[in-house]
């Protein structure tokens, strides 16, 4: 349902994301059926966000200048009622990253918070091991998702071996995906953009259902890619993953 709607709407998804993943993110969105724009010029965004369907803010390659860009872009998105997805990459790795993430969450309207366990744990003040964007192992992603949902009053997606989605106090746990996905730089960052595209093309009447389908589509594509690339390595997996995203249909996830 939501995937077909995305393909029909072809949502314009503005991605202010990190320098490492821009190409992969744009290609992933195109494969799925969305329309990516990677602009980082405020004068440009003033017009683009009037017609955009979603905005992704990914703080991966953070600078003082980019912090100001995030703030200005979110202000414009909020003014135009464009949903904003925040990916607080490595929020627990430095005080500066934590400060920026909390500023954006507390002072602007964010539609979805997406991160791994250690990133979201850092935002709610829980001590967890963090190794940059990959994060450390977190025992209870469900409780972290629930608490973050309560603290920030925003839908939350926490990714790990089991993914947790929390919306208005309701939680859903998902276990699809491939162990090869974390071995390709940008799969987590692309996920943030994919979630933005799904939200941006929906009517927002049931975020939990929308996010559940988005996560399942993404993770099942990873499973398909793993089978295709078996014995070939992570380079082949990356290509197979983009291929799988381009071929996904809702019926492929009916029993997942």
Curated annotation (Swiss-Prot):
Species name: Streptococcus agalactiae serotype Ia (strain ATCC 27591 / A909 / CDC SS700)
EC number from the UniProt entry: 2.7.1.50
InterPro entries: Hyethyz_kinase, Ribokinase-like
Record flagged with keyword Nucleotide-binding: yes
Keyword terms of this UniProt record: ATP-binding, Kinase, Magnesium, Metal-binding, Nucleotide-binding, Thiamine biosynthesis, Transferase
Pathway: Cofactor biosynthesis; thiamine diphosphate biosynthesis; 4-methyl-5-(2-phosphoethyl)-thiazole from 5-(2-hydroxyethyl)-4-methylthiazole: step 1/1
Pfam families: HK
Presence of keyword Nucleotidyltransferase: no
Database matches in NCBIfam families: PRK09355.1 (NF006830), thiM (TIGR00694)
Protein name, per record: Hydroxyethylthiazole kinase
């Amino acid at each position: 349902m939501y995937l077909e709607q995305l393909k029909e709407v072809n949502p314009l998804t503005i991605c202010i994301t990190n320098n490492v993943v821009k190409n992969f993110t744009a290609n992933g969105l195109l494969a799925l059926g969305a329309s990516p724009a990677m602009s980082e010029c405020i004068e440009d965004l003033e017009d683009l966000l009037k017609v955009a369907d979603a905005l992704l803010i990914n703080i991966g390659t953070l600078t003082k200048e980019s912090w100001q860009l995030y703030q200005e872009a979110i202000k414009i998105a909020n003014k135009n009622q464009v949903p904003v997805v925040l990916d607080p990459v490595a929020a627990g790795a430095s005080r500066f990253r934590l400060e920026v993430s909390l500023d954006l969450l507390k002072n602007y309207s964010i539609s979805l918070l997406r991160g791994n366990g250690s990133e979201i744990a850092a935002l709610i003040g829980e001590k967890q091991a963090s190794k940059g964007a990959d994060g450390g192992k977190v025992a209870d992603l469900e409780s972290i998702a629930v608490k973050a949902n309560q603290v920030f009053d925003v839908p939350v997606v926490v990714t790990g071996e089991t993914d947790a989605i929390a919306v208005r106090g309701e939680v859903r746990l998902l276990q699809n995906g491939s162990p090869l996905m974390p071995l390709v730089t940008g799969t987590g960052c692309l996920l943030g953009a994919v979630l933005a595209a799904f939200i941006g093309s929906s009517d927002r009447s049931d975020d939990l259902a929308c996010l559940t389908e988005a996560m399942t589509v993404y993770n099942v594509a990873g499973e398909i890619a793993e089978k295709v690339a078996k014995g070939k390595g992570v380079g082949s997996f990356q290509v197979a993953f983009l291929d799988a995203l381009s071929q996904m249909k809702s019926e492929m996830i009916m029993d997942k």
